[in-house]
Amino acid sequence: MDIIKTLYDYFPTSVYTGNSLVFISEDWRVELKEYKNTSFSANLKTVPIVRVKVFKKALNGEFLPGHYEDFQIDSVGELAAQIERYIQFSIGQNLRENV
């Protein structure tokens, strides 16, 4: 969860839930969560995997799961930049203004 706490500094409009970062707007919900490599042969320190899930609000008001992408970038600054770019292209809005 260290990477999620670190990413919180890059995304001040997000909400930290204890195990994920969540961005929410009237029409979208975006969730960032860290996943560990569960391979038994992976005893070496590896770059964490951050999964970004995008949900769109349906007509009934529920958020429906859409697409997701896994990011595994060593540099936290570059990781944050690529996640922000992915979210902006996914929802078609500027992350800092609308979500």
Predicted ranges, named:
Residues 1-29:
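Negatively charged, low-complexity tracts enriched in Asp/Glu with abundant Ser/Thr
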Residues 24, 33-35, 53-55, 74, ...:
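A structural detector for beta-sheet-dominated domains
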Residues 56-99:
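Mixed-charge, Lys/Arg-enriched low-complexity segments
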